[in-house]
């Protein structure tokens, strides 16, 4: 297919236009007085949401070159969401700010490669400054503060803090749609491991790309499964009992996987296959953990056991299993409580005796998964539209709180980044274009604060200047419209969320600045409608 190409300033201008359109739609949601965005859905009612990553992912532009820019900013939001779980709107605002200044300077003749170097130097300095400002998250109240700011809802903040207290920092918190109008917390014993479905055809919820199996039997095999004949006797028994199944094995491929997928699509079988977590001896231990938790046995050939001769009483059971592309969560495993506690005690002793930090860390992870349980937050709302928006907020708040526990907290509301201006301002480069890159980041650091104030109906420039002249943790609380000590007022951010957002923003912005040409397919012209035959005129309808 023939291609169209644009070069230089025109290429960068096109990408900037696409980025600007997405950034404008996303940035209106920032801060406690941010607004919502309505997304059209092909089926069902529109989605009213103020979640940056959901908005960014939904935008597709008609102009192919502008759409390239839109896709890049979608990547900023997605990557920030994947790593930090929150802060996607801040990352989008920062990308737009760095890019706007960057393109202005490159159009004026600055060298993009040197400007990129300056941007990277400034970002490293900001990260160091954020480290100096951070303070550990120790109390339940501090966890609640981070979650409250993220969700803009005090009740959600307290619920997440309570969930973290109950399952511990290593425990798993899942968010699901509730069946009532109230949001509730329930702690269920369960385990999560980092292995997703082997094939996306196992998905039962296509919107969330998850496979959810209620009343599930679990086949645990310490081997690769390629032949369907090995599984057939067990699956026939499971189907006869009207239950769902989960296969956890070293791998499932070939004829076995193809047959499972075909039967899943036909609706004959409802189940899923995932690879066993870990490698080598650790995999054997983790399979044993799952077996004890679910009341099953690991079918291993080294023990003289074979899949084709295994019986149903060797299988584990769980009330619910949720598998996405990266994780599997087993909820309410039906194992013997005494055996689970004995296994946990065995792992605790192994931790005490271990001399390797790496082994200790992995053992602690296993212990948390075995004894921590799963906290389930059921999000309630009066309508489905409100529930979806609320659920996205709770997910973000949960991720922000976990990020806060990992790396600590800093003053929120854009104050921490504004305080980093001074350190970046002290950076002096020998080269003018490198210095330009440093100055670009310095100017962009106040963009989130400006946007928060603007969304609250105030003059962003005045608020930025007032915060700049204040000291320490003093900042602008957009919720009350007052200048307060942000830490004391509970307006805090997780260091990890801010750091990841800035890193991704600088990375994508610098990539766009280095762009010199864009190549896209030439849109196909739609053919004109076929003409009628001569003499068809009014078709006798005169």
Curated annotation (Swiss-Prot):
CDD domains: GroEL. The keyword Signal does not apply. GO terms for cellular component: cytoplasm. It is found in: Cytoplasm. Its EC number is 5.6.1.7. Coiled coil: none annotated. It comes from the Bacteria. ATP binds at residues 29-32, 86-90, 413, 493. Transmembrane segments: none annotated. NCBIfam families: GroEL (TIGR02348), PRK00013.1 (NF000592), PRK12849.1 (NF009487), PRK12850.1 (NF009488), PRK12851.1 (NF009489). Together with its co-chaperonin GroES, plays an essential role in assisting protein folding. The GroEL-GroES system forms a nano-cage that allows encapsulation of the non-native substrate proteins and provides a physical environment optimized to promote and accelerate protein folding. Belongs to the chaperonin (HSP60) family. This is Chaperonin GroEL. It is an enzyme of class 5 (isomerase). Forms a cylinder of 14 subunits composed of two heptameric rings stacked back-to-back. Interacts with the co-chaperonin GroES. Keywords: ATP-binding, Chaperone, Cytoplasm, Isomerase, Nucleotide-binding. One of its GO terms (molecular function) is ATP-dependent protein folding chaperone. InterPro entries: Cpn60/GroEL, Cpn60/GroEL/TCP-1, GroEL-like_apical_dom_sf, GROEL-like_equatorial_sf, TCP-1-like_intermed_sf. It catalyses: ATP + H2O + a folded polypeptide = ADP + phosphate + an unfolded polypeptide. GO terms for biological process: protein refolding. Its main location: cytoplasm. Pfam families: Cpn60_TCP1 (PF00118). Gene3D superfamilies: GroEL, GroEL-like equatorial domain, TCP-1-like chaperonin intermediate domain.
């Amino acid at each position: 297919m023939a291609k169209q190409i644009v070069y230089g300033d025109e290429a960068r201008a096109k990408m900037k236009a696409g980025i600007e359109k997405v950034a404008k739609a996303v940035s209106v949601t920032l801060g406690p007085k941010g607004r919502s965005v309505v997304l059209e859905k092909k089926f069902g009612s529109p989605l009213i949401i103020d979640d940056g990553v959901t908005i960014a992912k939904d935008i597709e532009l008609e102009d192919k070159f502008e759409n390239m820019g839109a896709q890049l900013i979608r990547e900023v939001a997605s990557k920030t969401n994947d790593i930090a779980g929150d802060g996607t709107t801040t990352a989008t605002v920062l990308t737009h700010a760095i890019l706007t200044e960057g393109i202005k300077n490159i159009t004026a003749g600055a060298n993009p490669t040197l400007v990129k170097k300056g941007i990277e130097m400034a970002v490293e300095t900001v990260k160091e400054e954020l480290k100096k400002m951070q303070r550990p998250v120790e109390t339940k109240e501090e966890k609640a503060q981070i979650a409250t700011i993220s969700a803009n809802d005090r009740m959600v903040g307290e619920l997440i803090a309570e969930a973290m207290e109950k399952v511990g920092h290593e425990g798993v918190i899942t968010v699901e749609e509730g069946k009532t109008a109230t949001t509730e917390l329930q702690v269920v014993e369960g385990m999560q491991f980092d292995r997703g479905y082997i094939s996306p055809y196992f998905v039962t919820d296509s919107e969330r790309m998850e496979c959810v199996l209620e009343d599930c039997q679990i086949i645990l095999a310490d081997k690769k499964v390629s032949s369907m004949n090995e599984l057939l006797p067990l699956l026939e028994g499971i189907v006869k009992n009207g239950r769902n199944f989960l296969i956890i094995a070293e791998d499932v491929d070939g004829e076995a996987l193809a047959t499972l997928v075909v039967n899943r699509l036909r609706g004959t079988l409802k189940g899923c296959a995932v690879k066993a977590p870990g490698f080598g001896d650790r995999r054997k231990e983790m399979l044993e953990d799952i077996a004890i938790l679910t009341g099953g046995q690991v079918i291993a050939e080294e023990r003289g056991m074979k899949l084709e001769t295994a019986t149903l009483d060797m299988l584990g059971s769980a009330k619910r299993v949720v598998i996405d592309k990266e994780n599997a969560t087993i909820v309410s495993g039906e194992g013997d409580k005494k055996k689970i506690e004995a296994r946990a005690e065995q792992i605790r002793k192994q931790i005490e005796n271990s001399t390797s930090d790496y082994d200790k860390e992995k053992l602690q992870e296993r212990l948390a998964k075995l004894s921590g349980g799963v906290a389930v937050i059921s999000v309630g709302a009066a309508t489905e539209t409100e529930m979806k928006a609320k659920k996205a907020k709770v997910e973000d708040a949960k991720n922000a709180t976990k990020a806060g526990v990992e790396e600590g907290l800093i003053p929120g509301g854009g104050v921490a980044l504004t305080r980093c201006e001074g350190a970046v301002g002290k950076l002096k480069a020998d080269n003018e274009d490198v210095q330009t890159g440093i100055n670009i980041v310095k100017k962009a650091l106040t963009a989130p604060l400006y946007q928060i104030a603007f969304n609250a109906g105030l003059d962003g420039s005045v608020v930025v200047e007032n915060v700049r002249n204040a000291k320490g943790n003093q900042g602008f609380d957009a919720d009350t419209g007052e200048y307060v000590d942000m830490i004391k007022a509970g307006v805090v951010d997780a260091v990890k969320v801010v750091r990841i957002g800035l890193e991704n923003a600088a990375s994508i912005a610098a990539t766009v600045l280095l762009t010199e040409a864009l190549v896209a397919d030439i849109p196909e012209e739609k053919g004109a409608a076929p003409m009628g035959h001569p003499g068809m005129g009014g078709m006798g309808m005169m």
